[in-house]
Amino acid sequence: LNEALKVEGPPPAWAVNAGGPNGALPGSSANATLVLEPGTYAMLCRIPSPDGKSHLSKGMILGMEVQPTTEPVAAMPGGDIQMGLFDYGFSMTPPPTAGTHTFVVTNQAQQPHEVVLVRLEAGQTMEPWTAWLKGGMQGPPPGMPFAGITDINPGQVQNFTAELAPGTYGLICFVPDAGDGQPHVFHGMSTTFTVS
């Protein structure tokens, strides 16, 4: 399992995306709510190191067993913002306002997607992110990622909670495309929104 998942690019066909919280900056935390079926799971990190290699390829992976239970499984909690992921974009209803929100994320697409929520400078677009990625991710990223969920398959639903201050934000998907292996952001899967 460890060796197969360390290979860059899409996961092997036998590995099923389960989602989870997206990466957290040093000293911070991230959250996600999901329902796990009994089975074997791997927690891993695909975030690139300064040398361009993923943390996963350097060994950042941990196996986990989810045991069956005879207790009823709790229902997925609701949220106040519905977010759709599609090939290659995002939808949000209603538009976010300042404050703490729980995003209910549904993959409405034909392939896996993720959502990375980033804080941007006022008036910033997503072009600096694309340039940073195409330039080999040299230096710090052009915004501060702080919330979201990792890859979920078509039809999967997960939640995450984030506190939004007034400002400019971006949504990005870095999942490798099923067709050409390029990150979905290169296919236009990024957008900005403003919170007032």
Residue ranges and their predicted role:
Residues 114-118:
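Beta-strand signatures of extracellular beta-sandwich domains
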Residues 26, 37-38, 97-98, 154, ...:
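Surface-exposed loops/turns
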Residues 148-149:
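Intrinsic, low-complexity N-terminal interaction/targeting segments
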Residues 1-11, 15, 50-91, 95, ...:
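Extracytoplasmic/periplasmic copper-protein system
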Residues 39-45, 101, 164-173:
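A short tyrosine-centered beta-strand micro-motif
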Residues 28-34, 156-162, 191:
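Short strand-edge motifs at loop-to-beta-strand transitions and within beta-strands
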Residues 102-108:
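Short edge beta-strand/loop segments characteristic of extracellular beta-sandwich folds
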Residues 12-28:
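Aromatic/His-enriched, Gly/Pro-containing loop or helix-boundary segments
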